[in-house]
Swiss-Prot record:
Keyword Methyltransferase set for record: no
Assigned protein family: Belongs to the anthranilate phosphoribosyltransferase family.
GO CC annotation: cytosol
Name of the protein this chain belongs to: Anthranilate phosphoribosyltransferase
Domain of life: Bacteria
Entry's cofactor comment: Binds 2 magnesium ions per monomer.
Species this chain originates from: Buchnera aphidicola subsp. Acyrthosiphon pisum (strain APS)
Amino acid sequence: MRNILLKIYDSKFLNQEESYQLFTLISSGKITDIKLASILTAMKIRGESIEEITGAIKAFLDKMKYFPKPDYIFSDIVGTGGDAKNTINISTMSAFVAATCGLKIIKHCNQRISSKSGSSDILEKFNINLNASPEKSRKTLDQLNICFLFAPKYHDGFKYSNNVRTDLKTKTIFNFLGPFLNPATPPLSVIGVYNKNLINIAVNILKNLQYKRAIVLHSDNTDEVTLYGTTYVSELLNKKIISYQLQPESFGLKMHPKKILKINSLEENYHIIKEIMKGKGSKLYEELIAVNVAMLLKVFGYENLKENTKLALNKIRSGDVYKHIRNVANMLKEDNHARHNT
């Protein structure tokens, strides 16, 4: 451990194994707060390497609680957050639309970081039980194509660093781990990053973690596809990485001149999303969700983005997505009651 600390304090990078050892200790509560603060600060000042981030991810994955992983193909869709845009929860709603289209989605979710409402906050507004047992979540996935794994329920190793991270009041390596810590370890993923410079880092981490296929994207300082600018993409397929750019026309849509209005509260977020999922939302919001679903369909092998967008729009406008949300909530109610009665 001493050699690892000396390397960090000398502004030298750790290899993946050294990082794994360090974060195994951190996730076990074996590093004091003052030492942890110095480690995180030193790493932030010199910048964290792909190998260091990969080692940290593997350390937390090895300590996560069990989830019965399916033997069929499934994906996650997640954003890093941190863009401070306070828009509606695009990735969460895209997951529901994709499930309504027949894709299997296991979404790793957490509480809000910089937005007015995180994925778990909006799910609870829709009465989705995030404390469902792993077995119940898996059953919901099998029958309704989707389940949500709440990060604090599966990753209790983070509790040892929460106070230090709060006191530091700055982004650290921890802020970049979440999208890679899905307890089901999916073979597919779509990840949005808040900074264009993070695309290459994220896609190489996915390669290190041996994802089968994945997309990392960024557009207009947000962690999602937008309709008013260029979307920058790096895609991992068969261990090879390709990069390209997309415009709204790539999805068969027109450029929107105005940007999404900021959301001021959880209640406003919920109301807007509810109307969209009922097929009564604005065209801009419908299309914004649809293009993100199109990228999710792509990692499943549906390569035509224009056709993918049409399929997603049809599902959204039919109102079927809202019905699907209600079905998921109702299926999880039984487990919710059982939890409160034990």
